[in-house]
Structures are given as structure tokens and as C-alpha cells.
Amino acid sequence: MSGRRSKESEDQVPDIVEVNVTVPDGDERQAALAELEDALASVPAAGYAEVWVDHDSFPALCLLVNGEHGWLMCLRYSGDAGFSSRNPAYVGDPDATLEYYLSNGQRDVYPVAWAYPRERAVEAVRIFAQSRRVPD
């Protein structure tokens, strides 16, 4: 993961919704997909969230949410440095950044150019959960 990180004091950490869903291949698959939909619906429109979806550990996709923005990171296997989203449609300030919070309170800061609109990032999570692949 690329990005600057700093640990904030406990009184400065905002509320963060944490979602962890494993999508198995067997009979429990549909229940896991329904659980994911319910969890995604619980993320407040103006808040922060850390969402992890995996398929029996790997591959795994992480979505960090800050309001109307979402940043994605895919891990293919244990120890993978992973790869993260870049939004080729971004036309704003190249130095602009967004902060995200992990469920443990850690604050990460990434370029806004790496974020997608929240709904597009959430749709990528849905596609990954259903197909085991990261959408184009």
C-alpha cells in the first residue's frame, strides 16, 4: 500500500464502519453475498468505512470510504504488496489528497486521483464478491 500513514489520538478518530465478508464457493455463498449487501447499505453517506471482501482468504479486495469517495486495493495472495485504484477520469488538482481511516484508527492519506466516486467503488466490490475478479 502506498500512502502516508499516521496514528491519530483516540479522541480524534471518527466513527468508522468495519465490514469483513468472506465469500465461500459452497452453499453459504448466497448468504455471504446478502450479508455484504446489508453491510454496504449500513455505511453512512458522509462517513468512513473499511470494507474487506475475500474468497477464502485470497484474493481479497479492500475498499476505504470517505464520504462520496472510495479507494480500492486488491491483494492476490499472502504477502502480496497488492495494487490500488487509479482514476483516469480525475481532472482536479494533482496534489489534492483524501484521508481515510482504518477500523483500528490508523489514518491513511492518498491522492484524490486514486479515488473513485463511492457508488462506482462499491459496485467494484459487488463485482469482485460475485466473480472473484477486479473489474476493469
Locate the predicted segments by residue:
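Acidic (Asp/Glu-rich) sequence patches and key acidic residues
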Residues: 1-119, 123-136
